[in-house]
Swiss-Prot record:
It comes from Shewanella baltica (strain OS195). The active site is at 209, 238, 255 (proton donor). It catalyses: 4-phospho-D-erythronate + NAD(+) = (R)-3-hydroxy-2-oxo-4-phosphooxybutanoate + NADH + H(+). Substrate binds at residues 45, 67, 259. Keywords: Cytoplasm, NAD, Oxidoreductase, Pyridoxine biosynthesis. NAD(+) binds at residues 147, 233, 258. GO terms for molecular function: 4-phosphoerythronate dehydrogenase activity; NAD binding; protein dimerization activity. It is found in: Cytoplasm. CDD domains: ErythrP_dh. This is Erythronate-4-phosphate dehydrogenase.
Amino acid sequence: MKILVDENMPYVEPLFGDLGDIIPVNGRTLTAEQVREADVLLVRSVTKVNAELLSGNNKLKFVGSATIGTDHVDLAYLAERNIPFSNAPGCNATAVGEFAFIAMLELAQRFNSPLKGKVVGIVGAGNTGTATAKCLQAYGIKVLLNDPIKAAEGDPRSFVSLETIMAQADIISLHVPITRTGEHKTKYLFDEARLKALKPNTWFVNCCRGDVIDNQALIKVKQQRDDLKLVLDVWEGEPTPLPELVPLAEFATPHIAGYSLEGKARGTFMLYQKLCQLLNITADKSLLDLLPSFNIKAVELATAPNEKALLQLARFVYDLRDDDKMFRNTFLNENGFDTMRKNHQHRREFSALALAYDGQSEVDWLSNLGFSGVGQ
């Protein structure tokens, strides 16, 4: 069995090696000719899976995408061809949630404006939005959720309108899928009018899809309003973001919010489980066995940390400033965006860092944030 797989997916060999011949490929430049003889195709969001790519293949048994979203996959075409498909919903939700939370802590430090006491509006309450809310609520931050689709489906959480978030939130964090049609389309959800209407001193975080924001309009508005603080991980026109926009962001990264080692491993592992199910064989590999131990095994925690100490704790796991600096230095290079993604040293999630508990600190909230070892 020939398994064609994006070269940037981790842990493919230990998981799929016993199931067939693994053929790594460049996901962004993948051609129909390369796919022609594949039995299994495993992709990421950079690969457009459609009739143009697959029409020459008559033996495909399974298509898997190690992503939360599916907007890069023509699901109707796969259904028409009776080709089984699976993605990995929620695989990197924790990573994105922690990324957004860390970015807010970094902004708080940079501008000497504590995160504690601010109101955060989360637009999109699916997997990544929920993970972001979990971090914030563990730290005692008031969160407003906006998700008209979840609300209509009967989700029991309390939701507010986008207008309410824009009026009340000090920080807005975007976590919606990209939809280009329909009542709740999200393409250019934040157009020039909405961007201009943001309340003074808003922190604006985008970790979902670049064209949820009109990037040209964002440049125009930001140039007029220095009070707006931007954290941008996604960009319209990836992998070539508008060069004028990058310097306007406080933190800029190349679509890597979900790039934790745990999240990437989880995405590959979910596809492994699905393929085993499809082939009616036992999935006998373990996700925990794949992950290496963290290089800093434990941190002593004598008292509940203040915000500055919490940021230092978070930086043990991931220092956003490093990726921001590297991106600014490389994004204008040929293939700089994709090269940084490909060579990214996947960060760890909070759970990789064990906290030694002395029995005196009030640290339940750190456990809720995801750190391990608390209370043990």
